[in-house]
Amino acid sequence: MSNETATLVKLSAAEQAAAVKKGDVTSRELVEAHLKVIEAAEPSIKAFLKVSGDVALEQADAFDAKSAEDKAALPELAGVPIAIKDMIVTKGIETTAASKILEGWVPPYDATVIEKLKAAGMPILGKTNLDEFAQGSSTEHSAYQTTHNPWDTERVPGGSGGGSASAVAAFEAPIALGTDTGGSIRQPGALTGTVGVKPTYGGVSRFGAIAMASSLDQIGPVSRTVLDSALLQEIIGGHDKRDSTSIPEGPRPMVAAAREGAKRDLKGMKVGLIKELGGDGFQPGVEARFNEAVDKLKEMGAEVVEVSVPHIGYSLGAYYIIMPSEVSSNLARYDGMRYGLRVMPPTGVPQTAANMMAYTREAGFGDEVKRRIILGTYALSAGYYDAWYGSAQKVRTLIIEDFKKAFEQVDVLVAPTSPSTAFKFGEKMDDPLAMYMNDIATIPANLAGVPAMSIPAGLSDDGLPVGFQFIAPQQRDEVMYKPAAALEAALEDSWNGPIWNDLKTPWLDGLGK
């Protein structure tokens, strides 16, 4: 492998899988190459909370031995290593949700998606950093470390899943899993130049995903190409009887749609431009790249029309009532008695269970988690439930109906993913409302339960990535994969290669020499 490490890790996940099938490379060699990059990059990127190198090598060796005789029959992405957001439980590998309250917890079981990855022969490189309990938009709220954006290590990678996005962008992993509650896959995707997908709610099992807001959470792929995301989503998707919100049907034909889209023929497709998402609050560079991408869709034959989603302006307010309310309920289980952190009062003897719970939660939760628990508890309290939580759910229903009406007019909706490019560390930490505004364009899809995807749209005037978002009808995830793959191909053609050709990667220099 020697000095080929940098070349190998820059291959897409699909290309790495093809090399495994041909016998050009083994799964062990892929894992070793990425572990080298992780060792070199982590001092400056800090994407991983836990690197499970020994586990990944053991899984790779088992795969190589099993697949030695019949490589042609291998499933898609077989042998390709993957990184996992530390919000998804992994048997035998510490899982913390980036919180002190779960420090040292090693789950006795795997999430459904992890079982599927293992069945597909994908070794697990490690667990990636996030905002504590996936609550944040910058990955600055992790209890352990701050992840840096590979495009500018003085800037945030987005959140909550900045670890997975940065790991993929920095070539520490070819592909990763994240969770998306209000944009936690897509917004980091926009800020790091990666592809981030939130599947239809219920399209991927949530069994084994640590609950933040159960009616909004969704596991999805993080990758460098649209095809890689399609391949991964088909692997992890499908019905799971252990998840009561799981959709009964199997995965949609997303891989076929992505491959069809790469032909760059969008004749007959009607694309809706969400008129409420743009203008004030969106950086000029973001809007410029977005408009250029829309022009590319038109050049490929798509009909682009302006569409109104009338109640989308209320999304942020409704979300920040519904989500904290569910957080308040879900995080009540961390009480210091069943598992995780336990903190005693100074006397060493708690007067009551509530007394011990108070000390544990005070020490174990960070400021942003406490803020959301307080907000949610207030919204659910007697006398305020109908005025706050009940009203927010009514707004959510209106937004769901808005999307249904919009999709009667068009096949797919488009909007910028994030109103800005990556901001500097600390810039918004003291202003929660400014931080929350980062998700203004991603939250609506979570409230409506519809699938959405962010792909790179180029670099803004500040040299930082901009994201372009596709939103498709519920349970029609494949509809967004075709135009996304087409736009990806058209843009890369105009850039003379993928966006990461412009990324400076000093951690790759000299690898293997």
UniProtKB/Swiss-Prot annotation:
InterPro entries: Amidase, Amidase_CS, Amidase_dom, AS_sf, GatA
Keywords: ATP-binding, Ligase, Nucleotide-binding, Protein biosynthesis
Active site: K85, S160, S184
Biological process annotations from GO: translation
GO molecular function: ATP binding; glutaminyl-tRNA synthase (glutamine-hydrolyzing) activity
Keyword Protein biosynthesis annotated: yes
Catalysed transformations (reactions): L-glutamyl-tRNA(Gln) + L-glutamine + ATP + H2O = L-glutaminyl-tRNA(Gln) + L-glutamate + ADP + phosphate + H(+)
GO annotation, cellular component aspect: glutamyl-tRNA(Gln) amidotransferase complex
Highest taxon, organism lineage: Bacteria
EC number(s) reported in the record: 6.3.5.7
Pfam families: Amidase
Described function: Allows the formation of correctly charged Gln-tRNA(Gln) through the transamidation of misacylated Glu-tRNA(Gln) in organisms which lack glutaminyl-tRNA synthetase. The reaction takes place in the presence of glutamine and ATP through an activated gamma-phospho-Glu-tRNA(Gln).
Quaternary structure annotation from Swiss-Prot or TrEMBL: Heterotrimer of A, B and C subunits.
UniProt cross-references to NCBIfam families, sorted A to Z: gatA
Record family assignment: Belongs to the amidase family. GatA subfamily.
Protein name (record): Glutamyl-tRNA(Gln) amidotransferase subunit A
Gene source species: Bifidobacterium longum (strain NCC 2705)
